[in-house]
Amino acid sequence: GTEPYIVGGHTASGYWVDTKRATTVNGLFAGGDVAGGAPQKYVTGALAEGEIAALSAVEYVSENGISPIESSNIDSHISEVESFLTKKDSRFTTEQLEEAMQSVMDSYAGGIKTNYRFNEKQLDIADYKIKQLTELSDSLYAEDFQELMYIYELRERLTVCRSVIAHLKARKETRWHSFAENLDYPNKDDKNFNKYVNSRLENGEIKIILRDLVPGGKSYEHSN
């Protein structure tokens, strides 16, 4: 399986970007599959967005410079990296946790194993299991920097898992049949959920924000 993923190039999902492809994180730009708001753009769209994002990033740096990183943040990351490279008592490998992650999403979070169908009880189970895997990932061991990269890739994907689960749970309807079938809410609910479902990761918790749709022709820009 390949779940989880947030693919802005195929669906209406993706990270919130403005017209310059800036995300809500200052200095971070996105294009292609991770950039939301334009489904079915595929490779040509990714190439165009990549150029827009690159030019915007250059403009951002020229106007704002590169902010220095606080030494405390550097020390914290060095300590984390060293812990992955030195402790050898991990009960699981990165590959085992990745397979477990994919199994959880496939089975409980609307994955291919259930033909993209799910209910709230399954989502609760998925959320619980993904949090368990996230805790287990703290104790992983990397023999070299290549394996270290795999650990961080897994941890990022586990965060994406939590986001996918939170968004599926927040939209109490079925809007795109065959892509995601909410068995508890099998019908479309324009009255309550003809909206954007946004989220923010704040202090380790995902906060869901429902926003009204913007009519065609008008921009939907964020402000940091």
Please provide the spans of the model-predicted regions:
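Flavin-binding catalytic cores
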Residues: G1-E3
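Short loop/turn motifs at secondary-structure junctions and domain boundaries
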Residues: Y5-G9
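Glycine- and aromatic-enriched mobile tails/lids
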Residues: H10, W16-A30, V34-N224
